[in-house]
UniProtKB/Swiss-Prot annotation:
InterPro entries: EBP50_C, NHER, NHERF-1/NHERF-2, PDZ, PDZ_sf. Homodimer, and heterodimer with NHERF1. Binds ADRB2, SLC9A3, P2RY1, P2YR2, SRY, RDX, PDZK1 and LPAR2. Found in a complex with EZR, PODXL and NHERF2. Interacts (via the PDZ domains) with PODXL (via the C-terminal PDZ-binding motif DTHL); interaction is detected in glomerular epithelium cells. Interacts with SGK1 and KCNJ1/ROMK1. Interacts (via the PDZ domains) with SLC26A6. The keyword Ubl conjugation does not apply. Residues 135-146, 327-337 have a biased composition (Basic and acidic residues). It is found in: Endomembrane system; Nucleus; Apical cell membrane. This is Na(+)/H(+) exchange regulatory cofactor NHE-RF2. Residues 255-275 have a biased composition (Polar residues). Scaffold protein that connects plasma membrane proteins with members of the ezrin/moesin/radixin family and thereby helps to link them to the actin cytoskeleton and to regulate their surface expression. Necessary for cAMP-mediated phosphorylation and inhibition of SLC9A3. May also act as scaffold protein in the nucleus. It holds the Pfam family EBP50_C. It is a peripheral membrane protein. SUPFAM superfamilies: PDZ domain-like.
Length: 337
């Protein structure tokens, strides 16, 4: 077994030959991600030091750990004649999972960071394994990992923060589309497919794309982003809890049974039905926020008074008007930082 200090990811640059790249990619049951199944002798893949059993982390600088087999193959073929693959062997993968480190291209050049190093990324969902309990992701070689949001501190570099933000028509919210290798975003632990929850301590789940961009740019040289990976996002939505900074290191929420609403423990907030209902109960066009019922947030669901019912009916009629499309929304499909 190799010493931990000698373990590192490998960046393999392949130039396509007459018979292709010369390797076979496949998924493994019970493990997240795509793996190198076979490398042909004398092929470009063998020359690039790709090995059977390697797990694929990035393709051409884009993290693919959460993508399907078809999506990964498409990314490999997207650049004609060549491709760049960031991979980890089994020992390195296990070490990264044990230390809860996010695999980055920077590690291929510098090696794994020592403990408590300032540039060490935050824990991520990269560890492969089978799903564990409601509160964790179980790795085949280790204990369950707690599903927590991640707080990423970014300090702007000469080329910006180094990530791309976009919205998805099929689901609400803002998502990290891609992260530039070696960028401030990459070093902070920000990953592709993360969903953005807070910017500089303020929840942005109900904001439009242009408004979120403005909040990120509000502080000139740094930003603090609270994000969740797809698995953590699904877990918190299942509990109907809004992730906050308290969940990064503090107590995690637990489901409450016997018909009681699912509440966040230890000072957090209950996830409002705003994220679960159609647009009639979202923010009005003039920017006024949907008013939360303090009793409902504490787990109580009271019948509305006659005045409240009348006000709700009036608001419903007003909200039936089709909102005007913000020209910024038309112009700015996604933004680079």
């Amino acid at each position: 077994m190799a010493a931990p200090e000698s373990l590192r990811p490998r960046l393999c640059r392949l130039v396509r030959g007459e018979q292709g790249y010369g390797f076979h990619l496949h998924g493994e049951k019970g493990r997240r991600g795509q793996f190198i199944r076979r490398v042909e002798p004398g092929s470009p893949a063998e020359a690039a030091a790709l090995r059977a059993g390697d797990r694929l982390v990035e393709v051409n600088g884009v993290n693919v750990e959460g993508e399907t087999h078809h999506q990964v193959v498409h990314r490999i073929k997207a650049v004609e004649g060549q491709t760049q693959l960031l991979v980890v062997d089994k020992e390195t993968d296990e070490e990264l999972c044990r230390r809860q480190l996010t695999c980055t291209e920077e590690m291929a050049h510098r090696g794994l960071p020592p403990a408590h190093n300032p540039w060490e990324p935050k824990p991520d969902w990269a560890c492969s394994g089978s799903l564990g309990s409601d509160t964790g992701h179980k790795d085949v070689n280790g204990p369950p990992r707690e599903l927590r949001p991640r707080l990423c501190h970014l300090r702007r570099g000469p080329q910006g923060y180094g990530f791309n933000l976009h919205s998805d028509k099929s689901r609400p919210g803002q998502y990290i589309r891609s992260v530039d290798p070696g960028s401030p975003a990459s070093l902070s632990g920000l990953r592709a497919q993360d969903r953005l929850i807070e910017v500089n301590g303020q929840n942005v789940e109900g904001l439009r794309h242009a408004e979120v961009v403005a909040r990120i740019k509000a502080q000139e040289d740094e930003a603090r982003l609270l994000v969740v990976d797809p698995e953590t996002d699904e877990h918190f939505k299942r509990l109907r809890v809004v992730p906050t900074e308290d969940h990064v290191e503090g107590p995690l929420p637990s489901p409450v049974t016997n018909g009681t609403s699912l509440a966040q423990l230890n000072g957090g907030s209950v996830c409002s039905s705003r994220s679960d209902l159609p647009g009639s109960e979202k923010d009005n066009e003039d920017g006024s926020a949907w008013k939360r019922d303090p009793f409902q947030e504490s787990g109580l669901h009271l019948s509305p008074t006659a005045a409240e019912a009348k006000e709700k009916a009036r608001a419903t009629r007003v909200n039936k008007r089709a909102p005007q499309m913000d020209w910024n929304r038309k112009r700015e499909i996604f933004s680079n930082f």
